[in-house]
Amino acid sequence: MTQTDPAFQNLLAEFQALHAREPALAGFVALPDSLTPQPVTPVRIPPAALMESDPDLTTTAYAAIRDAFIAAGAVAQWRLTYQGSRLGADFMDRFACYCLIGEGGPFASDSLAAYVVYMPAGLYYPFHQHPAEEIYFILAGEAEFLMEGHPPRRLGPGDHVFHPSGHPHATRTYDRPFMALVLWRGDLETAPVLTYPEGEI
């Protein structure tokens, strides 16, 4: 039987409570009656420390889940999605993401995946896409979200943005960092790819 780290158990409880009280999350995907625990091999990356020590991840309503994501980061399998792509060391050393539900996370589900994404101030996450439908729910800080065919949107805590399947989107921070809960539904297996692998015009 898989023993789940208490930090992950606390994070799951905070996630379930947030999902129950936020219509945008509950309307995007239902939570299954039970989640399957699975073992996690911790992987540490440089931006994990940035997230843990960032003094500007300000939030009021979402401080509990923000702190739970930070605490569980110590035992998480941080992701290296864009390793080997055109995104260089500066991006890889500052963009942070790990999974709560899904591949590499402490819990498995066939119906959804759940991640935390962190970007410090002054970082651009280029246009990318994936078959999964996605919602970003901002927990702390602020970021600008771009989606092809739509005007940019600057979002803060409690705001959300939906990304349709296969639709290119990007994220930029300016003078503040941000942290978001990210949920996927649909194709949970196919990783994101850069829309313009050779570089944006």
From Swiss-Prot:
One of its GO terms (molecular function) is metal ion binding. Its EC number is 4.4.1.3. Disruption phenotype: Decreased dimethylsulfoniopropionate (DMSP) catabolism. It holds the Pfam family DMSP_lyase. It is an enzyme of class 4 (lyase). Gene3D superfamilies: Jelly Rolls (2.60.120.10). Belongs to the non-heme iron-dependent dioxygenase family. This is Dimethylsulfoniopropionate lyase DddQ. The lineage of its organism: Bacteria, Pseudomonadati, Pseudomonadota, Alphaproteobacteria, Rhodobacterales. The gene is dddQ.
